[in-house]
Every structure is written in C-alpha cells, then in structure tokens.
Amino acid sequence: MKKRSNVAVCRKLIVLVRPLTGFMLAAILMGLAGHLAAMFLTILGGYAILDAVGSYAGVGMKTALIVAGLLAFFRGILRYVEQACNHYIAFRLLALIRSKVFAALRRLCPAKLEGRDKGNLISVITSDIELLEVFYAHTISPVAIAFLMTIVMICYIGHFAWQLGILALLAYLLVGIAIPLFISKQSKNDGMQIRTQAGELSSFVLDSLRGLPEILQYRQGEKRLEEMNRRTDRLMEQEAHLKSVAGKNTGLTGAVILLSDTVMLLAAGLMCKNGTLDFSFALLAVIALMSSFGPVTALANLGSTLQNTFAAGNRVLDILEEEPVIEEVTGRQPTPSFEGAKAEHVDFSYEKEPILSDFSMEIPKNQIIGVIGKSGSGKSTFLKLLMRFWQTDAGTIQISEKSIDTVNTTDLRRMESYMTQETQLFHDSITNNVRVAKPDASMEEIENACKKASLHDFILSLPKGYETAVGELGDTLSGGERQRIGLARAFLHDADLMLLDEPTSNLDSLNEGVILKALKEEQKDKTVVLVSHRESTMRIADCVCSVENGRMS
C-alpha cells in the first residue's frame, strides 16, 4: 500500500469535484450566508437590547427585530440549499468513484487481482467508498465557509477595536487549526489501522461463509468463531481509542472556546473601563465572538473524524492509481479473423517462480489441439498467455501471424472463447448467466449453446426452466452443472479459437460424449485448444502435445 500524506489524499479527492464545481460554489455561498444569518440573529439581539436601555449603537430595536425575523426565515432555506448541494455532490461523486474503481479493477484484472484478498477488495468497494461521503458532504464546503466566516468576523469585530480583532483571529486559529493538528497527531495511524482491520475481518467472514461445509465437517466452527470474535474485539478496541481521542477533541475545543470568550470579555471590559472603547461596542464585540464559533468548531472536529475518511481515501486511491501488468491494445490494424497461433521459445514466471521455459507450440486453424501434463506443468498458464492476461518474460506469441502484443484487445476477445477450470456464476437466472458471453444473444442462440453443452434437457427439467436462479456462486448446482454452463458460454460466444481448460473434469461419460461430439462438429470452422487429464477427452484431438516442467515433450 502506498503511503500518502493526508494533504496528498485531500488534494487528489478534491480534484474529482471539478465537474461539480458550480454546485460546490453554491454550497459554499449558501452555507456562508446561512451562518452569517445565524450569527447576526444574536448580534441583532444585542443591538435591540442596547437600544432598549437607551444606548443606541446604530440599529434601532424595531429595525433589529424585523431584520432578525427575516434572517431567521432565510436561515432555514439557506441551510437546506447548502446541505442539498453538498449531498448531491457527495452522492454523484460516490457513484463516479465506484465507476472509476470498477474500471480500474477491470484494467488490473486478472494479473494484478489473482491471489488478492477478495474480502479486502469488497471492503474498499463498499464501506471505504461510502466513508468518502463525509469528505465531500461535510468537509470541503465547511472548511471554505469557516475560512470566509473568519475573515468576515475578524473585520466586523476589528472595526470596533483592532486589538479585539487580533484576539478573535488568535481564537479562530487555535480552534480551527491548532486543535485539529494536535488531535490528528494523536490519532495519526488509527484510521488506517481501523480500515485495514475492517478489510481483514470482512475477508475472514467471507472465507468462513464460503468454507462453511468444510468448517462444519471438520468441527472447526468453535475455533473459527473464537478467531472472528478476537478480530472483532481488536477492531472495537481501535475504534474505541479513536472515539476517546474524539472525546478529548470535543473537551479541548470547548475549553478553548470558553477561554477565548473570557479573554475577549476581559479585554473589552478593560478597554471600556479605560475609555478607549464605548460600552455598546464592547458588548457587541463579545456577542459577535461568542456566536461565531460554529464554523470553526466544525474544523476542530475534523482532526478526529477525518482519520477514517483519509485512510479510506488512501485505500481507494491505491486501486485507482495502481498500474496494470497488461495495457489494452487499441488503434492497431484490425485482425478480422483467426488464422492460427504460434508460441516460440516462451519463458514465463509467476513472481520469479518459473512456469514456462523455452516453450513452443503451433496451433493450426480448424484443428483440435490436445494439451496434457501434470498439475503445475504450465498448461493453464499457456491459455492465459494466449488470452494476453499476462506478458511473457521472453519469446513471442503470434495470433494470425501478428505478435499478440499488436493485436487490438477487442479483436483478441472477439476471436477467443476461454473456459476456466472454475466457472464463475452470478446470483441470477441460468439465461443471464449464459448470456454473459454474448449480451445481445437471442433465446434461440442460448438454447442452441446449452444443447451443445449437454445442458438443455437438464434446464427443462427445472421448475422455472431457463429462468431458474443458480444461487450465489452457483451453489444450487453441482460441479458438473456449473461446468456445463461455462461450456455453454464458450459455445455462445462463437469465437474462432476456443480455449478450454479441463472442460469435462466434472462430467460423467455420457455428458462428456455429447460435449466432445459437439466440439468435433465445431471443428470445421473453429480451432480448439483442449487442456485435460482425461485420455477419453483427448480422443477427439487431431494432435496431442505433452507439457512437462514448462516445456513441450
């Protein structure tokens, strides 16, 4: 994780506001006007009291009461508009950030996401992004409002006596800057530790739910629950510490405000006693300071409340700014069709662990190429390289007599269908799960693909047929049924090159025969690379290649 200062995180998050600058300016102006209205309600009360006791200070009682009534009326409207603008900005930007994060994950996938903690990713996508609402709705405009309010009130108090203006400035600096800086140092790492622990807890819970059958089978439920409670307690302790700091912040802020008011009262009283300041002006200056701490108090609270938000922002920025292993290829000469593939002297390693070494293979058009080998020999890795999910360390891979690095990514995806060993299913109907491979596919096309995958009859036996929901991760289906949905996707995609990784490993011999027959029939206008351990599956191959220790043998 890249370590950024809070200022750097703040600057990068503010840049995202640019498309909504108009709404942000409206929120600041409405907020400024609203706070001024609230403050001058009290100040006008002071003018009215002074007029009532015969010490006219420039505004009569009648005028003060009329203006105060108008300010009270408009205060509610201004506050509503300010909050509406702030939350419109916040929710629009949260949607934009989610879109950017999903685009970044798509760009990083699969090379940077293989082995990544999925629970932590879910935590970033959900709760971390949601925490940014505090920054966009309750931080940017309040900071600007506090800055502008400080200037206005210093000028107003200072016009009675410049010495009182200096006292007001010192009070605002203490409450709005010194206290947040002091408190933020005390809770410096709390926010990041809380977000990290929350992500780890989310991952632990997700793993526990997915592995629930194994946990129950091996009687690990109690042990797993104890670990979950331990992690939860540790997270709660961290949150309690942050809340304790927030409590200190509130107490310190209140004490400084009380001290500032007292000093202002004493200074104004002393000047009044010495005859350098009129009593009415002294009273108005004290009232003005006492009623003006609202905006800067909001700044004081940021020292503790923003630690979680900045930590969340840092985690979100990690995803947005992470560089992908593979960049999409665009703007190259189109590759209209698949005319064969070739790998020459390819080397590839996963994090310095050699997988393929001097690997070469030719894949002629309209043939079925079988690939066999022990687990870990590099068979599946070769298919991923053909999909350009990874970059080779050495050697070349050609598609249609072009280097794979020069083929437009859209052309490559159109020409290739890839079925992995584990079929990922979504909590949706069978129809929509198959349609993933071709979003505009007709129902007839989906049914034909399912027939080729020996899935059609099974689907019709279900109460809701093709509209049957498969459950989360396809947990209502057997391994073989999930695998056949993956095959149906590959058939529906109708690509020139089919890359099938163990397509029949979970199937009985009857379903295997139906699928192999369908693949053989597809051979006239398709090329198939078939990875399997089964000798029966390899019978349809025109050529069988053996991979051993990352080499052809």
Model-derived regions, located:
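An intracellular "coupling" helix at the cytosolic face of ABC transporter transmembrane type-1 domains
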Residues: 14-22, 107-111, 127-136, 140, ...
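Helix-loop-helix
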Residues: 51-66, 156-170, 248-314, 319-320
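Cytoplasmic coupling helices
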Residues: 84-103, 144-145, 168-213, 220, ...
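Transmembrane helix-loop-helix hairpins at lipid-water interfaces of multipass membrane proteins
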Residues: 21-78, 160-163, 276-279
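ABC-type nucleotide-binding domain
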Residues: 336-553
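Transmembrane helices of ABC transporter permease
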Residues: 19, 23-34, 71, 138-193, ...
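Membrane-integrated ABC transporters
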Residues: 1-37, 58-63, 82, 86, ...
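Short intracellular "coupling" helices and adjacent cytoplasmic loop segments at the cytosolic face
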Residues: 2-4, 85, 91, 99-123, ...
